[in-house]
Every structure is written in C-alpha cells, then in structure tokens.
Amino acid sequence: GIASLYSNTTGTHNTASGTSSLYSNTTGIQNTASGAFSLFSNTIGYDNTASGTSSLRFNTEGNNNTASGVSSLQSNTTGNNNTASGAHSLYSNTTGNDNTASGFYSLRFNTEGNNNTASGTHSLYSNSTGNNNTASGASSLYSNTTGNNNTAIGHYAFFSGDSFSNSTALGYNTVISASNQVRLGNNAVTSIGGQVSWTTLSDARFKTENAAKVPGIDFIKKLRPVTYYVNHEAMNRYLEVPKGEDVQNRSSLEAKNTYKPNYTKTLESGFMAQEVEKAAKELGYEFNGVDAPKNEKDYYGLRYGQFVIPLVKAVQELNEKLEQKDAENAQLRAKLLELEKRIAKLEKNASN
C-alpha cells in the first residue's frame, strides 16, 4: 500500500498491507500490519499484528500485541502482550499490559490497566486503570474504572460500580453494591440450591476466641418475626439497576435491553435487618448475622445461618433453668416425702 513501511531501515520480517501501514517502523521486526494506518507509529516494536484501519496506530515500542478490528488498540504506545478483537476494542490503551478484549468497544477506555479479560460488546467498557478483572457478557462490568480483581459473567452483570474490588457477579443483571461481595443472580431469582448444604470455615486451628459472651434468650426475645413481600421495583430503583433505555442513553451504540423480569410475588417470613441490628446493639452484641450497608448505595441483609448460635445459647440457657427447676423440684419432693412420713408417724402415735 502507499507509504507502507515508509521509514523502515533495518527492520526485518515485517509485512505491511494498506496505506501508511507500518509507516514509521525503523528497526522493529516481525510485525504484520493490514489496513490503512495500522501500526503507523511503530518504530522498534516487534511481534505485533494489526488488522483493520488504524489498528495499533500509535504503537511505538509495544511488543507482542494483536489487534483485529477498526481502531482496535489504536492508542497503544508501549503496552505489551495485549489482544484486541473487535472495532474500538482496547482503543485507549497506552501502557497497559496483558489485556484481552473480545467484542465491539470492549475495554474501550482502558489506558494503564493490566491483566484484564473482556468478552462481549461493551464489556469492561469504562475500565481505565483497573487490574485483574474478568468480564464475560455484553456490558458486563460496564462502569468499572479503577476496581481490581472483579469477575462478572452475564449480560449487564456488575453493570454499576466504578471502584469496587474483589467482587463477583454471576448472572444476568446481577448487582454488586460494595467490594468483597459475591452475588448470584438478580432479584427476580426465586431459587438457588444444590445437592448439599453450604459449608462455612470453622476450623479451631484458625480461630482465636474472644471474651465476649453470646447472648441467648435475651437476644431472641427481642426479635420480631414477620411475613412480608419484597418490593422488587423499589429495590431496582434504589440500586439503579439499568434498563435498556438507561444504557441506550449512556451510549448510542449500546444495544437496547428488551428483557422484562417476571417477578413472582411470594409471601416470605423473616426479620427486619434494622430491628435485628438494634436488638444486638442494645445488648452490646457484635452480631455478624447482620450484613450492614458498606456505602450509601448498598443495602441491608441477614445471614440467617448465624442465628443458630444465639438460638443454641438460648436453648442452653433454658435447659440450665429447666435443670435447676428439676433439682429444686427433686428437693421439694424429698422434703414432701419426709413430711408425709412424719405425718404418718404422728397419726400412728395419736391412734395409740
């Protein structure tokens, strides 16, 4: 193509096809450029492959990059070992390394983030400096910018949240509201299960006992069991769960989501988390059965399995009282028997 490999001096084993492809290359070797302005600025970078107009256009010293699609990895300068497949994928990457983007606009705004994997249109779209994130599904981890070590699988999974870390969202429209969370499914899900019960770490070798006592019956008496319905629409508004038109407004290129969840109105039984929290605080009990909000957009939850501990304590306290009453009753029966013997003896003496 016109002006392809125009500046090459000692670079070898390069292939350039398209106007001004590999235009600035001087000593870079083993590069392949196909498309106008592909690898245009490359000077000493090696083992790069660019396919598509302006793909890897501004790469100068980056190595081992693969870009397939219009403007894919266009802004890369010194980033290494990146793979971009899809128009505008990894478009803004400059120095980020070891990223993989597959899908239109995937990892679009990544600049310095490393070790990210995005699969699906607009996946990890807003990421700039976040590291070690994995997104699979259209618009998954869409809003993340600086968060690290996150995983999102499913269309719109982990859509909101720009700086959360170490969180995992599995399933369509699954919402993450804080760091260090794992969420399975959206709030239309009615059943999550498996063959066996969930296992929680409980190894005495890794526990340090605390002097704090677990309250039993005093805590249980403060709890108020209720029946209720969950207002899913109100929860979605609070969490800002995206609808198709919301995403459409963010980007004219975003596909419209036409899915409308079919919420099942189910009467449920349980407690109000705020009331449980209040009851625990009144007793000075640091109860980890309450999952309190971590920020202004997070919400309350309850870990019902943790209620077993104060319930066991309550049963033990009641059993202790019962045993005490049994002992007292035994003493009373013994005294009564002794009195009956004395009365019988007195009656016998009186008859004589």
Show which residues each predicted segment covers.
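Small/polar residue-rich beta-strand/coil "junction" motifs that cap repeat-based extracellular fibers
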Residues: 140, 144-216, 221-223
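Conserved SAM-binding site of S-adenosyl-L-methionine-dependent methyltransferases, i.e.
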Residues: 4-6, 11, 21-23, 28, ...
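Intrinsic low-complexity, repeat-rich intrinsically disordered segments enriched
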Residues: 20, 37, 54, 71, ...
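Extended alpha-helical scaffolds used as interaction platforms
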Residues: 4, 15-17, 32-34, 49-51, ...
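Glycine-rich, acidic and aromatic/proline-enriched surface loops and short helix-turn segments
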Residues: 222-225, 273-286
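C-terminal intramolecular chaperone/auto-processing assembly modules
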Residues: 250-253, 259, 287-352
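Short, polar/charged loop or turn motifs at beta-strand boundaries
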Residues: 206-211, 260-266
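Acidic, glycine-rich loop-and-strand cores that form catalytic or ligand-binding grooves
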Residues: 216-262
